[in-house]
């Protein structure tokens, strides 16, 4: 089974995706791990798409966690199930703040070998703040996902 978990930053995609992959004993693929390089440098789109294609082709079954709208054609080409983690704004924001605080406090490296760690400054006070990103994108992501998961789409068995 090929599953893509989508949702706004802080909604719980990674936690849910890891649990599903573990329960099904299939590979878990985190798109952020494929995208982010050292010093928070993103991977160029052509390379990112090639890396994603390679990761998806490596196993007949997988759980993929991530949005990256520009990858939709690649990740949904053969997907069996799309799961949208549709949390309310307050809960999503709370989860994003809690996660960012925990990561900053523990100085946790997010993706091995990148050296990327969240800090209180980066998480709360910078233009690259994941908290600000969550606030800015929650509503637009929700509208996009509603359209993607709407009755007229191929994903018409919705459980919210």
PLM region descriptions:
Residues 5:
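Hydrophobic anchor at the beta1->P-loop junction of P-loop NTPases
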Residues 9:
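The conserved Walker
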Residues 13:
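Conserved lysine of the Walker
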Residues 16:
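Hydrophobic positions on the alpha1 helix immediately C-terminal to the Walker A/P-loop
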Residues 19:
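Active-site signature of alpha/beta-hydrolase-fold catalytic machinery across serine-
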Residues 23, 129-160:
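NTP-dependent small-molecule kinase module
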Residues 27-82, 87:
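Conserved nucleotide-sensing/catalytic segment adjacent to the nucleotide-binding pocket
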Residues 87-141:
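A glycine- and Lys/Arg-enriched "phosphate-lid" helix/loop adjacent to the NTP-binding pocket
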């Amino acid at each position: 089974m090929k599953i893509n978990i989508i949702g706004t930053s802080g909604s719980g995609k990674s936690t849910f995706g890891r649990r599903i992959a573990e329960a099904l004993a299939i590979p878990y693929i985190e798109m952020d791990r494929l995208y982010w390089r050292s010093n928070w440098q993103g991977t160029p789109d052509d390379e990112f798409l090639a890396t994603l294609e390679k990761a998806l082709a490596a196993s007949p079954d997988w759980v993929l966690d991530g949005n990256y709208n520009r990858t939709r054609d690649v990740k949904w080409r053969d997907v069996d199930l799309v799961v949208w983690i549709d949390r309310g704004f307050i809960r999503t924001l709370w989860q994003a703040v809690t996660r960012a605080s925990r990561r900053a406090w523990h100085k946790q490296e997010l993706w091995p070998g990148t050296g990327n760690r969240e800090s209180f400054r980066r998480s709360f006070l910078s233009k690259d703040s994941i908290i600000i990103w969550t606030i800015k994108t929650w509503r637009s992501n929700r509208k996009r996902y509603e359209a993607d998961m709407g009755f007229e789409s191929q994903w018409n068995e919705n459980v919210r």
